[in-house]
């Protein structure tokens, strides 16, 4: 059996940069085989896209398990679709089992991804997250899968050195750390 595999670096225009993902357009249905291929690829995610009737179905696998949603592997899949599968297309829609329809639109220079919105709720577990991050966030929220920590200073986020072992003890897939920043708006005169 021969299965073409595309390796794509998302979020970059340079080789060997960005966030790599493997992309496979095929009729595979065997979850165990898909898991073995993802383990062999040994990238954070491998996306499998299958055309069924007029729709594309997508599944994502890490080297160890199937996952519910992956942004960079979806963007990588759209890149392959636009450049190798249907060069005339301007939209790439895929159906995900747990997240419904996901859409990527081709722009002049970028791909635009429309993903489901998470419903973040305030969390009071500041002591635990302070242990993980070494600093206390201004605000902390818990989404379906991730924690969202908000800081008042961009340099705190840039210089953060989380303890990932401690982070694993939280009931979360990951942590999103962001900061408030000040924007300088251009002056427009007529």
Regions found by a protein language model. Name each.
Residues 182-190:
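Single conserved hydrophobic/aromatic residue that forms the stacking wall/gate
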Residues 1-69, 74-183:
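Active-site proximal loop and beta-alpha junction motif in alpha/beta enzyme cores
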